[in-house]
From Swiss-Prot:
Domain F-box: residue ranges: 48-98
Ranges: LRR repeats: 276-301, 393-416
Organism: Arabidopsis thaliana (Mouse-ear cress)
Taxonomic superkingdom: Eukaryota
NCBIfam families: F_box_assoc_1
UniProt keyword terms in alphabetical order: Leucine-rich repeat, Repeat
Protein known as: F-box/LRR-repeat protein At2g40920
InterPro entries assigned: F-box-assoc_dom_typ3, F-box-assoc_interact_dom, F-box-like_dom_sf, F-box_dom
Length: 436
């Protein structure tokens, strides 16, 4: 009898501690995060207790305070929990209301042998802004590794002409079927690598992938150009659908760099020929293409602009802009062309001249743009890296250039030919699960 009373007392104390723990969780501030349960049994107990004692909205509020690693394990407790945590409603709620970490960089490296890695890089700390540190190697087999762009925590890669979508938070990797293009390269022509861009329509909460396929005369000429576009809705039963262009459409080849994704609109720079540049916009919701001419004055000094011009598409003050930096390494100057009126194709120009004390950061160094940060800084990186990896942050508002070293890159990547891509993700955690 005494033993039975003792067991009942221990059970009551255990339940009381659990109630106190949950009550403490509920009283936490919005920014507080719950520590993950130490074992599977406690995870199951917490899940059962939540469903029995709280309504669904309250359960979701509590779940949002757990780290993503705990949510991933909670999905294994039961089908009910898996359905709840994987629901689009909860994933969007988690993404839009919870800020777990500082914006960060993702670095994709690829060597001539086909070896690829994806590295997560911390943001510069307030105490020391001269370097950032590689935190995680997020590589998984078959991930792919070039032409990386991101939207809402999802990454888009291309490998062997197929698109892959990767969520670094959940490790989900989605491979899309190859496109059966209607255009075929004839003798004397070359088929450019397909370019993939991911976007999101917030109205219908739908993710879509856009692909541009182009053929032309053998490079460096861009004669006999022909291009087509395909769109893939990332949903159950999704498939590639050809986009019907508008009347003012111009066949073009996408620029190697110069892509810009603003959620519901995907934009990239392209060349209809060797001497004319355009900005191509694709509306994710309407699936319509728009061609915006770029002023010829941007590249008047270029002999063959499509081959020699160093310019990239960025966002500046909420507007689309072209950062022309061909003269940066020799003259320390760059031009910023801002699209003021899309309908009239009106552009304004602003010339930036580096401070003399910062000229050494760019002298005789060929740089490429790797995107912009949330506060408008342009991310520049050397085309070739040897003894160390670093990037430059260019504040266009204050005309200030800052060098930031990337520490922790594996030694095997030094002093060898490699290709790399960088992308800044302001909210880099997403729990969304995609189906096709």
């Amino acid at each position: 009898m005494k033993r039975r009373r003792k067991d009942l007392k221990q059970a009551a104390e255990s339940e009381q501690e659990e109630c106190q723990s949950i009550a403490q969780v509920v009283s936490l501030g919005d920014s507080d995060q719950i520590q993950p349960p130490p074992n599977k049994k406690e995870e199951e107990d917490i899940c059962e207790y939540l469903l029995q004692n709280f309504d669904l909205d309250h359960v979701m509020e509590i779940l949002m305070r757990f780290p993503l690693t705990s949510l991933t394990r909670f999905k294994c407790v039961s089908k009910q929990w898996s359905s709840l945590i994987s629901s689009r409603y909860f994933c969007n709620l988690l993404y839009t209301t919870v800020t777990r970490q500082q914006p960060r960089l993702y670095m994709c490296l690829k060597d001539d042998g086909g070896h690829r890695v994806l590295l997560s890089i911390s943001s510069p700390s307030r105490g020391n802004t001269s370097f950032v540190v590689v935190e995680q190697d997020l590589s998984i087999p078959g991930m792919g590794g070039f032409f990386l762009n991101v939207v809402r925590g999802l990454m888009c890669f291309s490998r062997r002409k197929k698109a892959r979508i990767y969520n670094p938070s959940t490790k989900q990797l989605l491979t899309l079927p190859a496109i059966k293009s209607d255009i075929v390269a004839q003798q004397g022509q070359t088929k450019h690598h397909p370019r993939y861009y991911i976007g999101h329509d917030p109205v219908s909460d739908q993710y879509k992938l856009v692909c541009t396929v182009a053929i032309s005369s053998l490079l460096p000429r861009l004669g006999n150009l022909k291009s087509e576009h395909w769109v893939f809705a990332l949903e159950a039963g999704g498939s590639w659908k050809k986009v019907v262009p508008l009347e003012n459409y111009r066949h073009h080849a996408p620029s190697t760099e110069g892509r810009s994704t603003s959620g519901s609109v995907v934009r990239y720079m392209a060349w209809p020929d060797n001497y004319n540049c355009v900005v191509v916009s694709f509306d994710i919701r309407s699936e319509q293409l728009t061609i915006i001419p770029v002023p010829r004055e941007i590249h008047l000094d270029e002999v063959v602009p499509a081959v020699t011009m160093m310019a990239d598409l960025i966002e500046y003050g909420g507007k689309i802009a072209i950062f022309y930096h061909t003269n940066l390494k020799d003259e320390g100057s760059a031009d910023l062309w801002v699209l003021e009126d899309t309908g009239k194709s009106e552009w304004s120009k602003k010339t930036l001249v580096l401070q003399p004390c910062q000229r050494h950061l760019v002298e005789d160094i060929e740089l490429i743009v790797k995107g912009t940060t949330q506060d408008g800084k342009v991310i520049l990186a050397p085309v070739e890296m040897h003894s160390r990896f670093y990037i430059l942050y260019y504040n266009l508002q204050s005309n200030d250039l800052r060098k930031v070293e990337i520490k922790g890159v594996p030694d095997s990547w030094f002093d060898k030919e490699c290709y790399f891509d960088l992308n800044s993700m302001d909210k880099s955690e997403s729990f969304i699960y995609l189906e096709t």
